A protein has these predicted regions:
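Juxtamembrane and targeting peptides
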Residues: 2-87
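A short linear-motif detector with a strong N-terminal bias
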Residues: 78, 119-126, 143-144, 172-176, ...
Length: 217
């Protein structure tokens, strides 16, 4: 969902905070906490945000990574059924949202197969963002279950015991910081998610994934 997001400012796709606004007036602006009087970096400010010594803007305390709860896999998602595959795919989306909001990709890694393109691309981009920034307010909502069906090994080239799960939903990239630039993408966008969920070693794991926006459909 966020594959090119962190490169947006550098490429000129989105304006940084303080430049010509592109966000609707109804969008809630990012919180801008004042620095502590005892802070050694209180003189270093950018757009109302305090700058820490490494040059990155300070993340608002009320949106700290610690305010996000790590997702838990539902018990029914541990069952070798189509419903189990569906719930495991929804959990996967929860772990991806958690990764963007916290920088912790481990739950997402645990539910996806190493080497798979969707998995590796998102892990790379989350790590790149948190090497020089942060994000909060990222969220994904499933609005419709399009299909949950067994996937043919012959037709799709998938592994045995694979269920294809397709969701319609919305995604919101929230507020991100890249270095000293704030990127406000706090708006819902319609998307379609598709996952190959494979039953392996006693549990569901994603062996393929994709997300399409309206322009890509």
């Amino acid at each position: 969902v966020f594959a090119v997001y962190i490169n947006g400012v550098a490429e000129g796709w989105w304006h940084a905070w303080g430049e010509k606004p592109t966000v609707a007036a109804t969008t809630t602006p990012a919180a801008r906490p004042a620095p502590s009087a005892s802070s050694p970096t209180e003189a270093a400010m950018s757009g109302g945000y305090q700058i820490v010594p490494d040059g990155v803007l300070v993340r608002p305390t009320e949106h700290a990574a610690s305010t996000y709860t790590k997702p838990e896999l539902p018990e029914e998602a541990k069952e070798n059924t189509e419903r189990g595959a569906e719930l495991a795919a929804e959990y996967l989306l929860d772990t991806l949202t958690y990764a963007w909001n916290t920088g912790d990709t481990q739950p997402f890694e645990d539910i996806t197969q190493p080497g798979e393109k969707f998995r590796e691309g998102h892990i790379k981009n989350v790590n790149a963002l948190y090497a020089n920034g942060w994000m909060y307010g990222n969220k994904t909502t499933v609005t419709n279950i399009v299909s949950v069906l067994p996937a043919s090994e012959k037709e799709w080239g998938v592994e045995p015991n694979t269920i294809a799960v397709v969701f319609d939903g919305t995604t919101n990239n929230g507020i991100a910081c890249v270095g000293q630039k704030i990127i406000d993408k706090n708006s819902d966008e319609p998307v379609t998610y598709a996952f190959f969920m494979t039953w392996k070693n006693g549990g569901w794991i994603s062996t393929g994934g994709s997300v399409l926006n309206n322009e890509q459909k």
